[in-house]
Curated annotation (Swiss-Prot):
Record remark: domains: ValRS has two distinct active sites: one for aminoacylation and one for editing. The misactivated threonine is translocated from the active site to the editing site.
Cell compartments where the protein resides: Cytoplasm
Stated family: Belongs to the class-I aminoacyl-tRNA synthetase family. ValS type 2 subfamily.
Enzyme Commission number(s) from the entry: 6.1.1.9
Alphabetical list of InterPro entries matching this protein: aa-tRNA-synth_I_CS (IPR001412), aa-tRNA-synth_Ia (IPR002300), Anticodon_Ia_Val (IPR033705), M/V/L/I-tRNA-synth_anticd-bd (IPR013155), Rossmann-like_a/b/a_fold (IPR014729), tRNAsynth_Ia_anticodon-bd (IPR009080), Val/Leu/Ile-tRNA-synth_edit (IPR009008), Valine-tRNA_ligase_type_2 (IPR022874)
Pfam families, alphabetized: Anticodon_1 (PF08264), tRNA-synt_1 (PF00133)
Protein name: Valine--tRNA ligase
Amino-acid positions noted as binding ATP in the UniProt annotation, renumbered to this chain: K531
Residue window of motif 'KMSKS' region: 528-532
Location of the motif 'HIGH' region: 45-55
């Protein structure tokens, strides 16, 4: 037990405990320490180096759960991973070093990515530790380490053996900036204004036709024209042939139900490919494939004189040439939604490429998702909507460098692909040979290692398997779902979707029991945080201004899980004030504790004690229920209300007399009650404010080890009668203290007596234990049934000289004297009977507006004594000074 410092100083407390926890391995996962384990599938973030408030919200939720589950007796695995691979890192390294990845050898570029990533991880870890997150750093993993990406390769091989991975040519989303295929989930639609071009196609042995397109640069790739079968304008022209302007190929007019006859001219050219709709028409009508775009976003030789132009430049020049040759009839602006690369915002193209794919089994994904508990429930709908909308398999190959190598080799003689066995992982096919010497198809021995790498979601989608100990400690058949997947709603269509897909495909099990979804953090102005808007706040800025514990509370109170949270400085300030209040209450309380306090036997509790313990029992149950339902806002609000109002403002004030002047037994009861409440509140608050509660815990007698290794408080002392009695005692004490303050009286000023009148004569609470109340208000207390016999008597009249002066001028003084000398009761009677009051002075009458007069009233008891009357929830309080 250590002495609590006089003042709350988070700047010294928080770093001290962060170091202490790490040195003592307080959060190390040891499954042998408990019969129950709780495993959290923590998000492995992209290590940008910038741990923003959105991260802080998500990881605060995770930490609340982890600390709560430890208090409940579980051995908790709270790991931390880092999703290192992929486009974000490569793009950043290219930007920082002002290079393109092809400017340096692949191995050198990969090392640059690793070095940059390691530095960013260190930065993010430092902020995580400043916020007091309780990861088991012995369970840290990085997807760029061979120990991890070897598992990704093993899972790839398992799925390939099961026929769920294949290589084929198929249209794919392609980013010209990043020069790689990307999955549907990595395409983000951006709304912008485009231009609709009305272009004439000359007929071949038939009349002309006008089509409408926003992409004239794709004319070289045009392989057909489609119209609605219900469009009367073209009903008799289906099958006609037309020549594509500038490029000369012939195309046929086709009917298709997906055409919107009201858009443009109603005739649409089919190109390979402008968008996914083009792909569907191309496949449905078995059209030719004409590729005109290069991987880096230029037109190829098939575009003739426009070859070599960037796509945007080609759009402009082709439109100009159409106009010059008389094919362009008109243009008009149009709103369009353009698919763009999630990382660089470049408009994606659709190219037909030979790639690696993973089969998407929608039914299995939906079944596994339905078996999980989604918090909030409507987030499950997002997953369902995305899954049901999937129309392509998952393209997993990427034409990049910094990612998990695809473990496969191509036979240069027959084209057979040999996939590595699980036992070969981790393997780099660009450096290592396949396990077989001869090709099983043709017997050849000339192999080329696959240079494509995997989508980074192939890494992070096996996190539940990694946490289960696969493949070293468990088999896929033995896999059991982990307890919790916490994540943001923005990656439901990626991380959640791909994990459901991969875990289901590999184990036929759901990956997790619960999915806890957090929203985004917005600025104080309600807008998305942005430096340009001036509403951007970094976690370390808020920590420096107040404390990590205060920031965590503010995030908890921001709203229920799944909802977006508006960051508000006032909430952080309020949390800081609460922590200071709790500190001061604890400091006061520990002054009355000693080593024997926890062991006090059979305390002689009074009503105030029983009331607080009963309220505490309710709070413990409420917090437990709220935490189990992930309602951190509700749990913290309930706890703060009890600690601030019931414990600090009411109970402590009620029992100060007993603590200082009470008999030993009475004093011991108050001490034990206070000890029970403070130790319980400390543990209940520990998930939210770990540093402050740890410091407080160490100052309390009878405690051992860390508060974060303690047990969740269970205070079984429910007493409805005591709760009612205590609430009334506290209410009266609170009202009298407020009245004394308003009167400018010292709070310890003696009063003649206080009478409590109870409206309900059968109210058992009329027999209150008034000892603590009497000590608190410094007055004898009488309990009386019924209503008090008091009367409100007018005792003084005051005139408004700002009205009377101008009205009566030289007589104003005489009128004011007459008002002062008048009978207040008579004046009040005139006010009640009309709008005018008459006063007399020196034999003269003066008429005044009733609004110019104020009558002061006082309560008088039947004895004639002046009293103060306070209406209470149970009846009336009468104060005799």
């Amino acid at each position: 037990m250590t002495e609590l410092p006089d003042s709350y100083d988070p700047n010294s407390i928080e770093p001290k405990w962060q170091d202490e926890w790490q040195e003592r391995d307080v959060y190390r996962f040891d499954p042998s320490e408990s019969d129950t384990q709780y495993v959290i599938d923590t998000p492995p973030p992209y290590p940008s180096g910038n741990l923003h408030l959105g991260h802080a919200l998500g990881w605060s939720y995770i930490d609340f759960v982890a600390r709560y589950r430890r208090l409940k007796g579980d051995a908790v695995l709270f790991p931390q991973g880092w999703d290192c691979h992929g486009l974000p890192t490569e793009v950043k390294v290219e930007e920082v070093n002002d290079i393109h990845r092809t400017d340096v050898p692949s191995d050198e570029f990969r090392e640059m990515c690793i070095d940059w990533t390691e530095d960013r991880i260190d930065e993010m870890k430092a902020t995580m530790q400043e916020l007091g997150f309780s990861q088991d750093w012995d369970s840290e993993y990085r997807t760029m380490d061979p120990e991890y990406w070897g598992k990704t390769q093993e899972s790839f091989s398992e799925m390939a053996d099961a026929g769920m991975v294949y290589r084929d040519e198929h249209p794919v989303n392609w980013c010209p900036r990043c020069e790689t295929a990307i999955a549907d989930a990595e395409v983000e639609n951006i709304d912008r204004e485009g231009t609709l071009h009305y272009v004439t196609f000359d007929g071949v042995d038939n009349g002309d036709i006008e089509i409408a397109t926003t992409r004239p640069e794709l004319l070289a790739a045009c392989v057909g024209i489609v119209v609605s079968p219900d469009d009367d304008r073209y009903a008799d022209r289906i099958g006609d042939t037309f020549e594509v302007p500038l490029f000369g190929q012939d195309v046929e007019l086709l009917a298709d139900d997906d055409v919107d006859a009201d858009f443009g001219s109603g005739a649409v050219m089919v190109c390979t490919f402008g968008d996914k709709q083009d792909v569907e028409w191309w496949m449905d009508h078995d059209l030719d494939l004409r590729t005109v775009f290069t991987e880096d976003g230029h037109l190829n030789e098939a575009a003739g004189e426009f070859a070599g132009l960037a796509i945007d430049d080609a759009k402009t020049q082709v439109a100009e040439e159409l106009d010059d040759q008389g094919y362009l009839n008109d243009t008009e602006p149009t709103e369009q939604s353009v698919g763009s690369c999630w990382r660089c915002d470049t408009a994606i193209e659709i190219l037909s490429k030979e790639q690696w794919f993973v089969e998407v089994d929608q039914d299995r994904i939906l079944d596994a998702a339905a078996d999980a508990e989604w918090v909030p429930e409507h987030m499950h709908d997002r997953l369902v909507e995305w899954t049901e909308g999937m129309d392509w398999d998952w393209v997993i190959s990427r034409q990049r460098v910094f990612a998990t190598p695809i473990p496969a080799w191509e036979c240069n003689e027959c084209g057979h692909w040999e996939i590595a066995g699980r036992e070969q992982a981790p393997v780099d096919p660009t450096e290592d040979d396949p396990a077989v010497e001869a090709c099983p198809e043709c017997g050849g021995d000339d192999w080329a290692g696959e240079t494509d790498v995997m989508d980074t979601w192939m890494d992070s989608s096996i996190t539940p398997l990694h946490l289960s100990g696969w493949p070293e400690g468990t088999t896929l058949d033995e896999f059991e779902s982990v307890d919790l997947r916490p994540q943001g709603h923005d990656i439901i269509r990626t991380w959640a979707f791909y994990t459901l897909l991969r875990t289901g495909a590999l184990t036929d099990e759901q990956p997790w029991d619960d999915v806890l979804v957090n929203g985004m953090v917005f600025g104080e102005d309600g807008n998305k945080m942005s430096k340009s808007r001036g509403n951007f706040v970094q976690p370390d800025e808020a920590i420096a201004e107040y404390s990590a514990d205060a920031v965590r509370q503010a995030l908890a109170l921001g709203g229920r899980p799944g909802s977006d949270v508006q960051f508000q400085w006032k909430e952080v300030k309020s949390a800081s004030r609460f922590l200071t209040k709790l500190w001061n209450i604890t400091k006061f309380s520990t002054g009355h504790f000693d080593e024997d306090t926890p062991a006090i036997q059979d305390p002689a509790y009074r009503d105030a004690d029983r009331w607080l313990l009963s309220e505490l029992s309710t709070v413990c149950e409420d917090v437990d229920e709220a935490m189990s339902e992930y309602r951190f806002d509700r749990a913290l609000r309930s706890l703060r209300e009890f600690a601030w109002e019931d414990l600090a403002d009411d109970y402590v004030e009620l029992v100060k007399g007993r603590l200082y002047n009470g008999r030993p037994g009475e004093r011991a009861a108050a001490e034990h009650t206070l000890y029970t409440a403070v130790t319980a509140v400390t543990r209940l608050l520990a998930p939210f404010s770990p540093h402050t509660t740890e410091e407080i815990w160490q100052s309390l007698p009878g405690t051992e080890g860390s508060v974060h290794a303690a047990t969740f408080p269970s205070v079984e002392y429910r007493d409805a009668d005591a709760e009612l009695a205590g609430k009334r005692i506290a209410e009266v004490a609170r009202e009298i203290r407020a009245w004394k303050s308003d009167q400018g009286m010292p709070l310890n000023a003696d009063l003649d007596r206080v009478e409590l009148y109870f409206d309900d004569s059968d109210d058992d609470a009329a027999r209150l234990d008034t000892y603590d109340l009497s000590e608190t208000v410094n007055a004898p207390i009488r309990l009386i049934d019924g209503r008090p016999d008091v009367e409100l008597v007018p005792v003084d009249v005051d005139g408004d000289d700002s009205e009377i002066g101008p009205e009566f001028r030289s007589d104003a003084g005489t009128v004011m004297e007459a008002i002062a000398a008048a009978d207040p009761a008579a004046i009040q009677a005139q006010i009640h009977s009309g709008d005018t009051v008459t006063v007399e002075a020196d034999g003269e009458s003066f008429d005044l507006d009733a609004d110019w007069l104020t009558v002061t009233e006082e309560y008088r008891a039947s004895s004639g004594e002046e009293v103060t009357v306070i209406e209470a929830s149970f009846g009336t309080v009468i104060i005799y000074e």
